[in-house]
UniProtKB/Swiss-Prot annotation:
Catalysed reactions listed for this entry: uridine(54) in tRNA + S-adenosyl-L-methionine = 5-methyluridine(54) in tRNA + S-adenosyl-L-homocysteine + H(+); uridine(341) in tmRNA + S-adenosyl-L-methionine = 5-methyluridine(341) in tmRNA + S-adenosyl-L-homocysteine + H(+)
InterPro entries per record: MeTrfase_TrmA_AS, MeTrfase_TrmA_CS, SAM-dependent_MTases_sf, TrmA_MeTrfase, U5_MeTrfase_fam
Keywords annotated in UniProt: Methyltransferase, S-adenosyl-L-methionine, Transferase, tRNA processing
Alphabetical GO biological process terms: tRNA methylation
Name of this chain's protein: tRNA/tmRNA (uracil-C(5))-methyltransferase
PROSITE patterns from the UniProt entry: SAM_MT_RNA_M5U, TRMA_1, TRMA_2
Gene (name only): trmA
Length: 365
């Protein structure tokens, strides 16, 4: 965190600097003009994590400022959603006088939605007992008069859900509303309004597509569910079981009937497509029946591994969302040999940081 950089009056200038840096970094690939999608300058993060500082009877949230090299008290937090800021104040007022709930509490995580739900995770350096459960249930009841809230308690090898461990987000994407189950402690796009812009951009660049879509690293189905409208069928892979379970829920709640999720890594799928290995998880799925002219990838920060990159290169069109411009640039060194970048976008998921979320559409030369 860098508190000094979090100044909404400088947001536009900081975003312009990011765009220039991105253009310069990718100039060798002769990319088209960068499409820039700005964030709200404040209250844009739908999740936030805070450490807890105990000082006598006082109790407060803090973060570590890497520039000041010190902890900074956070009674409110400009990047966090308005809902998180409201909950921060209400929760700390409840925790301060309650010995059972504050005892050895060291962290609080918030996950909120545009649809008005919020999940609060309380993390402890002690095992949680029946008294904690009783006090937490009473806390939830009191907070429920103001919030659509659920509470989770966590300790070493222990997790207590008072009700459920997820929220359901609703995103208005063009003329449709998509509903997404977002599970506590699983990856979700933190900036919901920019996430909407990412979905709308991905839908736009894949309009009038022919055939089917293959997606690797699909998470909770965020992109594949929205993109299903542009393809005959969608085949998507994801390794993390909680994300796969959420994706199946999201497919059902959004009434998507042309999307198949497979629980396997991108590397495993590459082996399956190359017929190097067979997998029981693929029983009943005829990979050869899919006519995937387009592949969508949203890899982790490490980028795409060499075997999967070779697989990706075999498709006519490649839609690549990247959370790390350095590994995207490395991957483009190979992809650029056979494909040309025809759309290029910067999504400002993380204002006031150096982080750049990018999107590229590549089409075979």
């Amino acid at each position: 965190m860098n508190l000094a950089a979090m100044d909404p009056t400088t947001y536009d200038a900081q975003l312009t600097a990011k765009r220039i840096k991105l253009e310069q970094a990718f100039a060798q690939f002769e990319t088209p003009s960068v499409e820039v999608f700005a964030s709200e300058p404040a209250h844009y993060r739908m999740r936030a994590e805070f450490r807890i500082w105990h000082e006598g009877d006082d109790l407060y949230y803090y973060m570590f400022d890497k520039v000041l090299n010190d902890k900074v008290r956070c009674d409110q937090y400009l990047p966090a959603s308005a809902l998180i800021n409201q909950m921060m104040a209400a929760l700390i007022a409840e925790l301060k006088p309650n010995h059972s709930l504050r005892h050895k509490l060291f962290q609080v995580d918030f996950l909120s939605t545009l649809s008005g739900e919020i999940l609060v995770s309380l993390l402890y350096h002690r095992q949680l007992d029946d008294q904690w459960r009783s006090e937490a249930a009473a806390l939830k009841a009191r907070l429920s008069s103001q919030f659509k809230v659920n509470i989770i308690g966590r300790a070493r090898k222990q997790k207590i859900d008072l009700d459920k461990d997820f929220v359901v987000e609703s995103l208005q994407v063009n003329d449709k509303v998509f509903h997404y189950k977002q599970i506590e402690n699983s990856f979700t796009q933190p900036n919901a309004k920019v996430a909407i812009k990412m979905l709308e951009w991905a839908i736009d660049v894949t309009q009038h597509s022919q055939g089917d879509l293959l997606e690797l690293y699909c998470g909770n189905g965020n992109f594949s569910i929205a993109l299903a409208q542009n393809f005959n069928r969608v085949l998507a892979t994801e390794l993390a079981k909680p994300s796969v379970d959420a994706a199946q829920y999201n497919i059902e709640v959004n009434n998507i009937d042309n999307l198949q999720i497979i629980r396997m890594s991108a590397e495993e799928f590459s082996d399956a497509m190359a017929k190097k290995r067979s997998f029981r998880r693929l029983e009943g799925i005829d990979l050869d029946s899919y006519v995937c002219n387009t592949i969508f990838v949203d890899p982790p920060r490490a980028g795409i591994d060499p075997a999967t990159l070779e697989l990706v290169q075999g498709y006519e069109r490649i839609l690549y969302i990247s959370c790390n411009p350095d590994t995207l640039k490395d991957n483009l060194q190979q992809l650029n040999q056979t494909h040309k970048v025809t759309r290029f976008a910067l999504f400002d998921q993380f204002p006031y940081t150096d982080h750049m979320e990018t999107g590229v559409l590549l089409e075979r030369r």
